[in-house]
């Protein structure tokens, strides 16, 4: 069964708790979404608050994918650029599909929904994201149409002696 996507959902308790639970589960499954396992919901909440502040200020939009039970199963944050010379593209952050839903094509569905959401924002011509090297995420994003446009070697320190490249990818929307 396919996910149902909603851009800018009402951020009630169920969405908040669903996003925190999703982020915690993805992180603990090894997902490269800003943390290294193990993490708890208490570790995640301050990062979510940062996104919520940006949403309240109109700088970020939240895309949520709901499963057939109406639970949060996927998310992505679309962050607008404030620099006057870069307002024609946006950032895609914290792209997540719950581990129990992986392998069903939901990641591609999420990426397509994010691209559609970006196309619906006036003046947006491209989507940019970064991903952690060594995870295979760059191959996934390439399969979704993104092109690698840059790489910063050893920019992400996962652990002492385990530095990963920060891979910059771009999806032109034209």
Model-derived features: positions:
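Acetyl-CoA-dependent GNAT
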Residues: 5-94, 98-100, 111-113, 117, ...
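Short hydrophobic/aromatic beta-strand or adjacent loop that forms the aromatic wall/cage
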Residues: 60, 164-168
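Active-site acidic-Proline motif in GNAT/NAT acetyltransferases
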Residues: 98-100, 104, 133
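Residues forming the Rossmann-fold NAD(P)(H) cofactor-binding site
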Residues: 108
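Conserved GNAT acetyl-CoA-binding A-motif
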Residues: 111, 118-131
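Conserved catalytic-core motifs of GNAT/GCN5-like acyltransferases
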Residues: 128-131, 142, 147-165
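Helix-turn-helix
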Residues: 137
């Amino acid at each position: 069964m396919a996910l149902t996507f909603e851009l800018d959902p009402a951020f009630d308790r169920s969405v908040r708790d669903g996003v925190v639970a999703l982020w915690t589960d993805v992180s603990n499954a090894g997902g490269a979404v800003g943390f290294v396992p193990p993490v708890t919901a208490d570790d995640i909440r301050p990062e979510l608050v940062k996104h919520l502040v940006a949403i309240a200020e109109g700088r970020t939009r939240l895309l949520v994918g709901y499963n057939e039970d109406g639970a949060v199963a996927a998310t992505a944050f679309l962050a607008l650029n404030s620099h006057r010379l870069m307002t024609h593209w946006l950032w895609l952050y914290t792209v997540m599909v719950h581990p129990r839903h992986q392998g069903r094509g939901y990641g591609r569905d999420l990426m397509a929904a994010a691209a559609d959401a970006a196309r619906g924002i006036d003046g947006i011509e491209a989507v940019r994201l970064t991903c952690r090297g060594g995870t295979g995420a760059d191959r996934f994003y390439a399969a979704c149409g993104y092109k690698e446009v840059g790489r910063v070697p050893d920019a992400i320190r996962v652990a002492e002696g385990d530095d990963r490249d920060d891979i910059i990818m771009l999806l032109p929307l034209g």
